[in-house]
Amino acid sequence: MSEQPVLDTLADMTAASVDHNSLSPREYMLARVAALVAVDAPPMSWLANAPAISESGLTAEDIQGILIAVAPVVGGPRVMAAGGHILRALGIAIAVADAEIAEAELAAAEDGQS
């Protein structure tokens, strides 16, 4: 059994929903970000979606546009909360990716010295 069965299950559900829709990956993530804002998703939900958001090619401007578009429907406080969650999640995701790249470069350098 996995050490993180809940996260693994959520990742499987996300992968299945990506595979079974007619949207492009970019359109899919536009809709997903809007939904996360609308349901006032907690930081962990944003963190779980951060890799897919990054991989879809959404820019900071795209996310800003989503926040502006949904603000009249979901309200200012939700948009403000989402902004903070997005910043933390994407910041963490970037830091993790940077650490993984650094580890890979270090491993490659060590292999080259052997």
Label the predicted regions.
Residues 1-30, 38-55, 79-114:
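Acidic, glycine/proline-rich low-complexity segments that act as flexible tails and inter-domain linkers
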Residues 29-42, 64-73:
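An amphipathic alpha-helical micro-motif enriched in hydrophobic residues
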Residues 52-56, 69-72:
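Short basic/hydrophobic patches in alpha-helices and adjacent helix-turn junctions
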Residues 58-63:
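Winged helix-turn-helix DNA-binding recognition segment
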Residues 64, 69-88:
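C-terminal structural segments of small proteins and small subunits
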